[in-house]
């Protein structure tokens, strides 16, 4: 999610000129599994919301445990696991550092929507291979973005849901004791919840707009939770404020934004003619971001996570401190619904 994101084409519409709509964006596409190599699950192509560069993501089955990102350029390859200890940035996005054989590093940014979908669909063995679809102005690049698509997680859900895995014993993190991290009025709280679920609750204000949203993922009977996710959380788009556009453009951000991939706030309303896609879309998108960020723990966190006006930086700092304070303990979710600590195995 791009907190306080404002994009280029949306603002031109606010000034009375036209913008590019989805019907004109033939670059965003999905390749079916049937016409692809056996290991290729899907492909998505689209623009990076900050860089404005077109990127292809090829999602493949992998023998490696977990989710991995990779990128190749000039005969050099870079990769990283999708884990919080590979974090490289949390400014208006979540980014990880990919390393190669050389000392050079490449950052993979805007991973949170993809990660949220992969997490909810319980994927454990996939690799997301990113490739630029145009020649960069410089010989080497230091950042590549996961495409923003329509600004939500819907297209990622469609692409990833067929790859869902069924495990006889699912590794999890158990919230073993209450923990709270605050930065001023912004707070995150982890609470013990003796059930096979992860509960999310968010409340916050966006200018003059106050919103709340919640979501519960039941890891034992996930289909119902996934259906709820598709209705309440996945459609929520990244958003930002109209008045922030000049500052962001001056920083080289939001170059790929449009009304097709972002919900733009202006006062107590929205620039987008259709307004919100779902009720409390802003708060729902904050939960989407939180799911993607906390998925970097590598395993589901069983417990309740309450967020007040939190964003990427607070999410990842709270996760780090939760581990450092031994608030998250390894465990397993068994098919009969029992949740046991790793020490009990």
PLM region descriptions:
Residues 2-345:
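Short acidic-hydrophobic catalytic motif
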